[in-house]
């Protein structure tokens, strides 16, 4: 048994690079942390319970790559290159029964050109339900606010659970083009007719 408990008072990171390659997998993740600080961490390895009171990641970049997946134009979740990252977490906790996360600010830019100027909100998930009570996201062109509660069995064929979503969004053409990619000509023609 691993009965270690690690208490972290304050951790500051500057000009730090982290690389991760999964064994028996082609997945590659690289994080560049120019300036970050973690306050109030508690890690119970026996109970697999982890919490952080505050995280301020002021500048950095992340590369996430699955090299054997075909690359596509636009936003490509198999080949992410995120830059200008700044993330503020007010609280984070995880154990096998529940996950809680509160993001107070988030900015980043993807290689596709998609740029998030502001994002944040709370997120909670347990073995039964996922909750997103106050999510918001803004780009230079678009805005989105959402509230969602979803039972994890919401899409079961038999006795499905509930999904409640309240969405208020204004999505602009430049963001859709950045997400879909300029090579997606059929979608661009449809967008041009929609916005005309």
PLM features: what roles do these ranges have?
Residues 1-21, 31-46, 55-196:
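Extended amphipathic, helix-rich lipid-handling scaffolds
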Residues 23-26:
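Exposed regions on extracellular, virion, or secretory-pathway luminal proteins
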């Amino acid at each position: 048994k691993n009965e270690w408990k690690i208490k972290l008072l304050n951790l500051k990171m500057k000009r730090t690079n982290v690389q991760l390659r999964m064994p028996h997998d082609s997945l590659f993740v690289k994080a560049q942390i120019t300036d970050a600080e973690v306050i109030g961490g508690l890690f119970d390895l026996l109970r697999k319970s982890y919490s952080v009171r505050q995280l301020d990641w002021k500048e950095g970049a992340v590369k996430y790559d699955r090299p054997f997946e075909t690359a596509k134009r636009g936003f490509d979740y198999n080949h992410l290159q995120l830059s200008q990252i700044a993330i503020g977490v007010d609280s984070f906790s995880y154990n096998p029964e529940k996950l809680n996360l509160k993001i107070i600010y988030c900015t980043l830019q993807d290689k596709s050109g998609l740029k998030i100027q502001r994002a944040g909100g709370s997120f909670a998930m347990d073995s039964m339900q996922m909750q997103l009570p106050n999510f918001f996201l803004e780009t230079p062109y678009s805005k989105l606010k959402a509230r969602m509660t979803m039972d994890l069995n919401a899409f079961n064929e038999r006795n499905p659970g509930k999904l409640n979503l309240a969405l208020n969004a204004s999505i602009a053409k430049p963001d859709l083009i950045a997400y879909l990619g300029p090579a997606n000509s059929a979608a661009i023609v449809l967008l041009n007719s929609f916005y005309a």
